[in-house]
């Protein structure tokens, strides 16, 4: 098992050579989530010939930008460190790959859905999930 394999693995490694490999991540594109579909469709409308999709670092960056946006909104546009730090506490978004995310108040850490996926023929089949896992609960 590995904690960071995503669908981009199959661009570099034939899926049959890693059949059955398990991974635990915050998103797989096989998840039937409305926002995932919206983002996937927008990406492939623009980059139809791409063999790669944005992997886990990109989804984390997306989530971070969405949470930052919510902090800016909550601070009424005050970009001072103090105002943004206060506004980030408890910030949340539903517009993130893999589902919602929230900064746990008082911690500065993000909680989000987590999924265990197993490669079945070049797709990570989600075999287990946990909603809104706080940081540090996975290991």
Regions found by a protein language model. Name each.
Residues 1-139:
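Extracytosolic ligand-binding ectodomains
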């Amino acid at each position: 098992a590995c904690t960071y394999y995503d669908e981009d693995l199959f661009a570099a490694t034939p899926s049959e050579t890693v059949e059955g490999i398990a991974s635990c991540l915050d998103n797989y594109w096989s998840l039937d989530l409305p926002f995932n579909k919206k983002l996937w469709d927008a990406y492939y409308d623009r980059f139809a010939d791409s063999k790669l999709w944005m992997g886990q670092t990109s989804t984390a960056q997306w989530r971070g930008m969405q949470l930052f946006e919510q902090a800016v909104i909550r601070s009424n546009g005050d970009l001072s460190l103090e105002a943004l730090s206060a506004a980030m506490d408890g910030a949340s978004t539903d517009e993130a790959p893999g589902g919602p995310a929230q900064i746990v108040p008082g911690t500065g850490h993000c909680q989000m859905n987590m999924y265990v996926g197993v490669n079945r023929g070049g797709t990570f089949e989600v075999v287990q999930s946990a909603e809104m896992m706080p940081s540090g609960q996975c290991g």
